[in-house]
A protein has these predicted regions:
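Conserved short alpha-helical segments that host acidic/polar catalytic motifs at enzyme active sites
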Residues: 1-253, 261-296, 335, 448-451, ...
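A SIS-like phosphosugar-recognition module
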Residues: 44, 167-168, 177-181, 187-188, ...
Length: 612
């Protein structure tokens, strides 16, 4: 959620710090600040609001120093004010701390520190860490690294911390517990950040940090220890994408760019997944034929849009592999004593690999004896590292808060898993797998067809921009599409939007319909259970009560009672979510633009939710 950057090296530190924070804006924030390593007393500047407020406050008198830390805050403890913004400092103004996460025992720490004479100036949990570190550093004769190790032992919660002290301004110390932190290795300069996007302009060499590992960074060295001070061998890797992938590339917004990148993202996730003898290739699962055939249940855990991908997984895997599938909201999963045993496969879906609710559910599942397969878009993130296996999607960096291409690649990933499991356990013939895979390979081109005809949809959006309620209806595989359409509209347009299963309409939701209420219906096609006849009845029901009906339907499908029809290419029924979701993304995007909202950084939201 919060964005964290640290820099030490030959550059004027304000430049990599501000640029790094700019590249982390997608994470969501409501204030920003920096601490520069000026000798004697740190230079601190922080402002509520956008990063531009901070930039505008930095005048020509800004000191030219070569180390510092920067932060974008997403408020949890205390409102979004200048005083609550990070960095937070000790009473001497010599030690500064930035923090992502939550310190659960901060009130207890604050009381103890105030009793010792420390003066607090904010409402945050973070300020307690600054004062605690100040005391511990003195106990360790100025050793900030040793102080950090002891501080972490005293803290409860999930967090990433970075600290700097004016007496050794070129040294930055960091630690992570259940929250992301990565080190960037430069030439005579080094970086720390919550995401590699912050420093990819400067280096593509990175180090992944493990749980409770403390990193001490200077311009020419990076040392990592555990909480007992024992050295840890760094795990270096090369970042696979470049800085241009985190630029808008001529599009008005990152979200629009990412919508148009979906054909390539889907194609990249599919490439090379069928062998010459028509076998789905998923070596990453690390499961033998016997282990797959012994599976009795699959549980999918996810949050937000990824949860909707999980719902699609249920339809696909049960259809193809004949294995029962439960789909759980990750934040609820571990609080009800779920039944898990070695015959249970847990599929954890997370774009960032750092979603805290999903990570906690993964740990609970593993402790209960389940095998965990992660579906993730971010290499070397925490959830893949703690899972038994990982299937990486190939969406590339997704900067906009609202998920688009990451969601579609997650759906493609669950299709591949379903086909593989069904093929191995004998529920699908090789010829069936071959034919379905060929249909999957046609999806990128079909998405392009949809994107080539979005202009009428943009015009349509303007006629609905002033409505304050929009309802979405779907049946079977169209139900998660309806939920996703409603979520996107809530996130981006700040409109009350709800998705319902069509069969539930008469059980309450129809009471919401009045004159002029927009209703978007996803018309099923090609289903085995006569669903094609059910949704038209729902359309007539809402139209009779004054609704303005928009229908998403396949080319050639007969539609009655709709004010507007959005056509999508023909595809097998289970693959329709990949296509039907795209016009709903465009609809939500255009609604946000017309209403003047911040498309890439919607209010109150964060890209990667790293607190519970």
């Amino acid at each position: 959620m919060c964005g964290i950057v640290g820099y030490t090296g030959p550059q004027s530190a304000s430049h990599p710090l501000i640029e790094g924070l700019r590249r982390l804006e997608y994470r969501g924030y409501d204030s920003a600040g920096i601490a520069l390593g000026t000798p004697g007393k740190l230079f601190i500047q922080k402002k509520a609001g956008k990063l531009s407020n901070l930039e505008n406050s930095l005048d020509e008198s800004l000191p030219v120093v070569h180390s510092g830390i920067g932060h974008t805050r997403w408020a949890t403890h205390g409102g979004p004010t200048d005083g609550n913004a990070h960095p937070h400092v000790d009473n001497e103004g010599k030690l500064a701390v930035i923090h992502n996460g939550i310190i659960e025992n901060y009130t207890e720490l604050r009381s103890q520190l105030e009793a010792k004479g420390h003066k607090f100036s904010s409402e945050t949990d973070t300020e307690s860490v600054a004062h605690l570190l100040s005391d511990l550093r003195k106990e360790h004769n100025g050793d900030l690294t040793a102080a950090m190790r002891d501080a972490v032992k005293a803290l409860r919660g999930s967090f990433t911390l970075l600290a700097i002290h004016a007496d050794a301004p070129d040294v930055i110390v960091g630690v992570r517990r259940n929250s992301p932190l990565v080190v960037g290795l430069g030439d005579g300069e080094n970086f720390m950040a919550s995401d590699v996007a912050a420093f990819i302009e400067f280096t593509k060499r990175a180090i992944e940090l493990g749980q409770d590992e403390v990193v001490t960074m200077t311009p020419t060295s990076v040392e990592i220890t555990d909480l007992d001070g024992k050295p840890v061998k760094p795990k270096q890797y090369e970042i696979s994408w470049d800085a241009s992938a985190a630029q808008k590339g001529g599009f008005a917004h990152f979200m629009l760019k990412e919508i148009f990148e979906q054909p390539k993202a889907v194609a990249d996730t599919l490439i090379g997944r069928l062998s010459d003898n028509n076998q789905i290739v998923l070596d990453e699962l690390h499961m033998s034929t016997e282990e797959i055939r012994s599976l009795k249940k699959i549980t999918v855990i996810a949050c937000g849009s990824a949860y909707h991908a999980g719902m699609v997984a249920k339809y696909a895997i049960e259809k193809w592999a004949k294995i029962p599938v439960d789909v759980e909201i990750a934040s609820e999963f571990r609080y009800r004593d779920p039944i898990i045993d070695p015959s249970t496969l847990i599929i954890a879906i997370s774009q960032s690999g750092e979603t805290m609710d999903t990570l906690m559910a993964v740990r609970h599942a593993k402790a209960a004896g389940g095998r965990v397969l992660a579906i993730c878009n971010t290499n070397s993130s925490t959830i893949p590292r703690e899972s038994d296996a990982v299937l990486y999607t190939h969406a590339g960096p997704e900067i906009a808060v609202a998920s688009t291409k990451a969601l579609l690649t997650q759906i493609i990933a669950v299709y591949l898993i379903g086909l593989h499991l069904g093929q191995v356990n004998g529920s699908l013939k090789d010829s069936e797998v071959r034919d379905l895979y060929k249909e999957l390979l046609e999806l990128p081109g079909k998405i392009e067809q949809i994107l080539e005809t979005v202009e009428p949809l943009r015009e349509l959006t303007r006629t609905f921009a002033q409505n304050n309620t929009v309802l979405f209806l779907g049946r079977n595989i169209g139900y998660p599409v309806a939920l996703e359409g409603a979520l996107k509209l809530k996130e981006l347009a700040y409109i009350h939007a709800e998705g319902f299963a069509g069969g539930e309409l008469k059980h309450g939701p129809i009471a919401l319909i009045d004159q002029g209420t927009p209703v978007i219906a996803i018309l099923p096609a090609g289903h085995e259970h006569a669903l094609d006849e059910k949704m038209p009845s729902n359309i007539q029901e809402v139209k009779a009560r004054g609704a303005r009906v928009i229908v998403i339907a396949e080319e050639g499908a007969h539609v009655e009672g709709a004010e507007h029809v959005i056509r999508i290419p023909i595809a097998p029924a289970l693959f329709q979510p990949v296509l039907a979701t795209v016009p709903l993304q465009v609809f939500a995007y255009e609604m946000a633009v017309v209403r003047g909202n911040d498309v890439d950084q919607p209010r109150n939201l964060a890209k990667s939710v790293t607190v519970e």
